Amino acid sequence: MNVRQHKASFFSVVITFLCLTLSLNANATDSVLEAVTNAETELGARIGLAAHDLETGKRWEHKSNERFPLSSTFKTLACANVLQRVDLGKERIDRVVRFSESNLVTYSPVTEKHVGKKGMSLAELCQATLSTSDNSAANFILQAIGGPKALTKFLRSIGDDTTRLDRWEPELNEAVPGDKRDTTTPIAMVTTLEKLLIDETLSIKSRQQLESWLKGNEVGDALFRKGVPSDWIVADRTGAGGYGSRAITAVMWPPNRKPIVAALYITETDASFEERNAVIAKIGEQIAKTVLMENSRN
């Protein structure tokens, strides 16, 4: 074989390898997005996904710049705002909030047990709303930071120009199609979650506290947690609202690697609660399969 033939053969091998690698990566990425589009068809829904693998830099996005109802995923942001105020010396996490039965709204499984007693600290209220999605606890947290507009102002201050909260629980869950109130986009939420739980927007202590509350979520077992391997650590917040809205935001740590940050929103569907939960679990499973496939190659 002469030099020219040798070079041609070498470049042919290189090009074939690169094409195969790109093809495998594309197929891995597309399998997640295919799961989302299949879910849209199955549910007759509008679904938005943004996910970022911080280990590899891989991203998955589907309708990631479209607005979706926040529902209870705002509760992570509200508690992060409290923690930032604590970091700045403007608030105490042990400050006690007292309330009566007249202050409660629908679905208050924790706060209803504390009516007429000594009250609950801001830390206890955040734990209640992030673990059980207690709506009254969320409203008390909103009161502590200055209301929905104050939360939106906090988000603008950390670079989120998209997410907005306009109302209180439970009205914010109305989720009328086309209404921009109380909405976010999947990509905005993922970016904000990274700032709050990964970057240095909050102190280390506050990041660890927020992460701990989210890991203690008691109402997310049928969603991403069901779809990913049992040895993954998941810190998540779920949500549900009108017009078939269902949501989950999560940071998921596979063993011995950086996490995946994800936001998945479903709306405008007549599918049952169980059907919506099932497709979220299925999408989470596909993300996990793709990540594990990447790990096996490295």
UniProtKB/Swiss-Prot annotation:
Substrate binds at R237, T238, G239. It catalyses: a beta-lactam + H2O = a substituted beta-amino acid. InterPro entries: Beta-lactam/transpept-like, Beta-lactam_cat, Beta-lactam_class-A, Beta-lactam_class-A_AS. Disulfide bonds join C79-C126. GO terms for molecular function: beta-lactamase activity. GO terms for biological process: beta-lactam antibiotic catabolic process; response to antibiotic. It is an enzyme of class 3 (hydrolase). Its EC number is 3.5.2.6. Pfam families: Beta-lactamase2. It comes from the Bacteria. Residues 1-28 form the signal peptide. The active site is at S72. Keywords: Antibiotic resistance, Disulfide bond, Hydrolase, Signal. Hydrolyzes carbenicillin. The class A beta-lactamase family has a specific amino-acid numbering system, sometimes called Ambler or ABL numbering and often misspelt as Amber. A multiple sequence alignment was used to derive a consensus sequence and then the consensus was numbered taking into account insertions and deletions. This allows use of identical numbers, e.g. for active site residues, despite differences in protein length. UniProt always uses natural numbering of residues, hence there appear to be differences in numbering between this entry and some papers. PANTHER family: BETA-LACTAMASE, BETA-LACTAMASE-TYPE TRANSPEPTIDASE FOLD CONTAINING PROTEIN. Belongs to the class-A beta-lactamase family. This is Beta-lactamase. It comes from Proteus mirabilis. The lineage of its organism: Bacteria, Pseudomonadati, Pseudomonadota, Gammaproteobacteria, Enterobacterales. The gene is blaP.
